[in-house]
């Protein structure tokens, strides 16, 4: 391993560490955000249809995410994570998931004073708030009970 490899690894770890620390602070600050009421079966069904239309291209038809989703690309952006039980989506409060979907990752974090490169675009101009909540309800409906 030459000096440039060491520097590249150091830089990548620094970006992940600093971004992760900022993201953790943001998550803790939004942990008490209230969500919509318990979704009905029709809401979950609509959420599945919307997920397939707007989300599956990046997050996978089976919510599996993109390959090697824990490793940032050359641009410093992490691939789309899975939304099944193997990912980290279930760790986040509903309000965080809503903001990320509506505003996009970078904008949602920027509201909290966190600078972080995210490949997640915002869908607030394409989806209503109710539709975003239905997508979240669909994703959550696929998780094992212990992760809901």
Q: What spans do the regions from the language model cover?
A:
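Extracytoplasmic electron-transfer domains, predominantly the class I c-type cytochrome c fold
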Residues: 72-140
